[in-house]
Amino acid sequence: MVTVEQLAARREAIAGSPDLTALARHIAARNARVLERLPLVPEVKALLSVDGGRCPDDGRALVFDPWSPDEHTCPACGRRHAGVRHHRAWAKFQHLWLAERAVELAALAALGNDPGSAAARSAEILCTYGDRYFGYPNRDNVLGPSRLFFSTYLESIWILNYLGAAALLREAGALDDATARAVHTVADEAANLIGEYDEGFSNRQTWNNAALCAIAVWFEDEDLARRAIQSETGLVAHLRGYRDDGLWYE
């Protein structure tokens, strides 16, 4: 995990680098609208279906717009579509997008010039999921247990950004007790979900192991870290999948 000293060093590096300063401005611009108002946090879990998220006329994937939860545009014909299946397909990308916003806002709070508003919005996203996480049902899954999605590895990708945001806020001194409790709640349940579904020697299991490592660091759980890294299906075992040709094989 990042430390206070590392954050201070990065702030100095950003201040002294035109490229890093430009990158910081780009990230700030990308999140400007989120700072103005909180995007909709879906009240539903994502659903994988044959027709959800696709144009019924030409089969093209509908455009993801985080600010349009109910109307979804086909990039080919321009028609707008609505309905439960389209909304739940949209929810997959929205959940992932919100976690990305949370961690980028936390980075702005830890490294930027205007930390207050970015930290507050990031914490608001974390707390909202803390309040709702157990309300997302662990059902209608395709590959393993999940509350927000239909596959465990997606939950793993999501929790990595979620915990990344929390860790940055904590080291920046911007993680209040209520937000910390929300993060604890989500991380504990995510560990149970992800930990019970081992996909063996699989590319998806690398995401699961990475997520369990992040959770282990958050809770300072050495046993969980050891399992995610050193078990028969841990990260080290997956690294052995690299062959002499540089490719990785399941």
What are these regions (language model features)?
Residues 181-250:
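Extracellular polysaccharide-recognition and catalytic grooves
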